[in-house]
UniProtKB/Swiss-Prot annotation:
The keyword Nucleotide-binding applies. This is Adenylate cyclase. Its EC number is 4.6.1.1. Residues 1-535 are annotated as: Catalytic. It is found in: Cytoplasm. It catalyses: ATP = 3',5'-cyclic AMP + diphosphate. It holds the Pfam family Adenyl_cycl_N. It comes from the Bacteria. The keyword NADP does not apply. InterPro entries: Adenylate_cyclase_1, Adenylate_cyclase_1_CS, Adenylate_cyclase_1_N. Keywords: ATP-binding, cAMP biosynthesis, Cytoplasm, Lyase, Nucleotide-binding. PROSITE patterns: ADENYLATE_CYCLASE_1_1, ADENYLATE_CYCLASE_1_2. Residues 541-848 are annotated as: Regulatory.
């Protein structure tokens, strides 16, 4: 037994040294310095060293002995300090060991790879000590970043995996969805930089189920010494729930980095396909280690992963995804085999051997090696391949869940975050800008972009077509359009957010007076100034909350501009009564089209289009409908107006209206429920009613319609609209009826559980509401606000004789007689009257 254990230790040490050498071999001197010094900086704590902070900070790595590079560094520090450094020696120090894991040291490591480091610490550290150690690690991350090396430290309690503890989706340790699988990746890829050897490697595969007993027997026999080994526990049997959760997590990661994540996603799919007889990859590597089978180029973790996935996809006869995963693997290695190397390293030798086995052509290699220059056509093709592969994995995952009748162990919050990010990235919706370049190619910019409009009635669909060519007939005819949409805003947004359209792109446009190059360039400039391309990924909190509009642009008269007809015409209007929604004698709405462009809290980019006289109202209702009552206000709301005339007035009026409506929407029911806003468009008055769950729009052609709208939003009762000769009103109401003013009469019911309302408009038309249960004060307040808020709110053809504020009365019993008294409410004290200016003749202006 002793000889067997010693042989295993020698193999482990040899493979570990091979991995250290490989981790350093392909990297530059800066990475080599950081990688080599990290153990030293965790072992020592000194003001002249990176990572230093005042106070009691746990430091010291068990069994640490500096190598030549590390000793030279320590000697330099001592020379600067002027005296020897105090170093922790012997005993059980706070840090059990320091280990890199993941792609580091494997064939998957390249010059852009980051570095994941596990700092395993003793279980006896208290929370304050752990926090201090975390602060030290954060300072070391910043030090490495200042040198151009991305390092992420993960503090691992040595008992963490025994207690089934987990992190959350906020960090790279992948939340509650992975536990054993995280340990699986660590065991198969860990490189010991300093500290104790990993005990798990010493336990034969056949003893895995008796892991703890076997370890105790080794200690009891004196074959192993307990304080020389890091023991994170065995790899117990995986549940179907854990496979499901981990696979969702990998799909989540694949959204932002698809090439990097496809291989791991398919490994998990292979695991679930073999379930319940799955053998984790770490177990396979350990089995070969114990048997002395140092295959796969030194038990390289990435090569072993590719081998397992290849076996799985071959068994299910999925050649499409097998070819894709090989391409992903090739690109991950970052060795361009079609080009002559400066030197031939071990990665290139391995990759050349694999490519030869796959039978790839020189042309295929050249295409992959030219990835940095891929443009939109090739990137979209690659994106679709990756999307198809991920969706196939997702479908297989759902089948797996159904087959095993899963109750998913991932926390419901994590599952919500994962599925929402998948939805936000992959769900194709009308108006949504699909982002097709998640780290596939670094530059999709185009030298020329041409937007061509096809009117209705032609052979092609009416709408806009985008080409990445200058607008010559030969170029356009011989090329397929990159993208089509009915509306220009969607095409411009798609080109901008996918990186085709940059400040250096030359723009061309062909349309029949809908839009010209100047207007197009203005739109591009406005979008680029207000919508940054790069934003932080949405937080888990944002993903498990309802999506909210973050940045909103309201694009006015881009495609249809009513003011264009004013050119060289004499237009009659009065500047003091200028209303861009009901302009001039014809009461024309000067907004012909509105496009919305917004980015939400899930980082989705959406566009919408509205045209015609109702564009303003439809756009308003849509914007407000996307804001739930408790949403945060948008971070920015910008109005881009492209009218030929009165541009500033139109922009200002829309900005004012939208801001006011957003304020009403987000403040309704917090203070004053059921608020509304009257808007006059094309000579008609419309009411926007702000309720708890929605915003409704109703036309208010006359007073009775308005009261009906108010009452339906405010009161619960039976509404009957009648004429005075069809019903006998209470005599006291008949006696009070007066033409030219609007009157409300409130009457209590016999059971005292509600009230009736009699409404008489200016022409004494009547509307009656029986058994109302709402608030009289709220109704009075809203009606009063409506009538004190704007001029000329109904059509000129309505039969108003006077425009007095409504009168409110209460029907009461006094001294045995039915009487009418004024309705008393604090609300009435807040009313204000807008004095109308004396009428002035309209002035004439000629617009050019």
């Amino acid at each position: 037994m002793y000889l067997y254990i010693e042989t295993l230790k020698q193999r482990l040490d040899a493979i570990n040294q091979l991995r250290v050498d490989r981790a350093l071999a392909a990297m530059g001197p800066t990475f080599q310095k950081v990688y080599s010094l990290l153990p030293t900086l965790l072992h020592c704590h000194h003001p002249l060293m990176p990572g230093y902070l005042d106070g009691n900070v746990p430091h010291g790595v068990c069994l640490f002995t500096p190598n030549e590079t590390q000793q030279d560094y320590l000697s330099e520090v001592e020379a600067k300090w002027g005296e020897p450094l105090q170093q922790s020696v012997g005993g059980e120090l706070p840090i059990t060991g320091v280990y890199s894991m993941g792609s580091t040291s494997s064939i998957g490591q390249c010059h852009t790879s980051d570095l994941d480091v596990w700092v395993c610490h003793q279980a006896w550290l208290d929370s304050e000590e752990r926090n201090r150690l975390q602060e030290k690690c954060s300072l070391l991350e910043k030090w490495a970043a200042s040198m151009g090396v991305e390092v992420s430290f993960f503090l691992i309690d040595e008992n963490r995996f025994r207690h089934n503890a987990s992190g959350s989706l906020g960090g790279e340790d992948c939340g509650s969805t992975q536990h054993i699988l995280l340990l699986d990746e660590f065991y198969r890829s860990a490189v010991r930089l300093a500290g104790k050897r990993i005990l798990w490697n010493m336990v034969p595969v056949e003893e895995e189920n008796n892991y703890d007993d076997y370890v105790l027997s080794l200690y009891a026999q004196g074959v192993l010494t307990p304080n020389e080994w890091l023991d994170l526990g065995g790899l117990s049997t995986l549940s179907a729930e854990e496979y499901f959760g981990a696979s969702l997590w990998q799909l989540y990661k694949s959204i932002d980095s698809p090439y990097k994540a496809v291989l791991k996603t398919l490994l998990l799919e292979a695991y679930s396909w073999e379930y319940p007889n799955s053998q984790l990859l770490a177990m396979e590597i350990k089995q070969r280690l114990h048997a002395g089978e140092i295959v796969a180029f030194g038990l390289d973790a990435y090569c072993m992963m590719l081998d397992r996935v290849t076996r799985y996809l071959t068994q299910i006869n999925d050649t499409t995804r097998l070819n894709l995963v090989r391409r992903c693997f090739y690109l991950k290695v970052c060795e361009k085999l079609s080009r002559s190397p400066a030197s031939v390293g071990w990665r290139r030798e391995i990759l050349s051997q694999l490519v030869s086995e796959w039978g790839w052509s020189d042309e295929s290699l050249a295409v992959l090696d030219n990835r940095a220059n891929w443009k939109i056509e090739r990137v979209r093709e690659a994106h679709n391949e990756l999307l198809d592969a991920m969706m196939q994995s997702y479908r297989n995952l759902i089948r797996f869940a159904r087959r095993n009748n899963l109750s998913v162990s991932a926390s419901p919050q994590d599952i919500g975050v994962l599925t929402r990010k998948l939805y936000a990235a992959f769900e194709a919706l009308p108006g949504k800008v699909t982002l097709v370049n998640p780290q596939i190619s670094p530059d999709l910019s185009e030298e020329h972009l041409t937007f061509i409009h096809v009117p209705a009635g032609r052979a092609n669909r009416a709408g806009w077509y985008l080409y990445n060519q200058a607008p010559s007939m030969d170029a356009i005819v011989s090329h397929q359009p990159l993208e089509y949409n009915r509306y220009l805003n969607k095409l411009v947004s798609w080109a901008y957010f996918n990186g085709l359209l940059t400040s250096k792109t030359r723009l061309h446009i062909k349309s029949a007076n809908l839009c010209d190059t100047v207007k197009l360039q203005e739109l591009v400039t406005d979008i680029s100034h207000h919508f940054p391309l790069r934003l932080p990924a949405p937080t888990p909190k944002a993903l498990y909350s309802p999506c909210e509009i973050r940045h909103l642009a309201i694009i006015v008269n881009l495609e249809h501009d009513p003011t264009a007809a004013f050119r060289n015409q004499v237009v009659h209007f009065d500047f003091r009564k200028l209303d861009v929604f009901s302009f001039g004698e014809q009461q024309q709405c000067l907004v012909g089209s509105i496009d919305l462009l917004y980015r939400n809290s899930w980082n989705e980019v959406r566009t919408l289009h509205f045209s015609g006289e109702q564009a303003v109202l439809e756009a308003l209702k849509t914007i407000l409908g996307k804001m739930h009552q408790d949403a945060a206000p948008p971070e920015s709301v910008d109005v881009f107006c492209y009218s030929q005339h009165l541009r500033g007035l139109i922009r200002t009026r829309i900005q004012q209206l939208v801001s006011e409506c957003i304020e009403l929407r987000l403040s309704s029911t917090r203070q004053e429920p059921g608020r509304f806003k009257a808007v006059r468009v094309s000579g008609h008055t419309w009411g926007l009613f702000f309720e708890r769950l929605s915003v409704s729009v109703q036309k208010l052609e006359n007073a009775v319609e308005f009261y009906g709208a108010i009452s339906n939003n405010k009161l619960h009762g039976l509404s009957i609209q009648v004429e005075t000769d069809q019903i006998h009103l209470p005599p006291v109401v008949d006696g009070f009826a007066s033409e030219g003013i609007i009157q409300f009469f409130f009457e209590g019911t016999a059971d005292e559980k509600g009230f009736n309302i009699y409404i008489l408009d200016e022409s004494n038309r009547v509307e009656v509401y029986h058994h109302c249960e709402g608030s009289k004060e709220a109704l009075v307040r809203d009606v009063s606000r409506f009538y004190s808020s704007s001029h000329d709110r109904f059509t000129y053809g309505s039969s108003f004789i006077n425009f007095n504020l409504p009168q409110f009365y209460q029907i009461v019993q006094l001294d045995g007689r039915t009487q009418v008294i004024p309705f008393r409410s604090n609300t009435l004290s807040h009313l204000y009257i807008v004095d109308r200016e004396p009428s002035q003749p309209a002035q004439q202006f000629q617009l050019h």
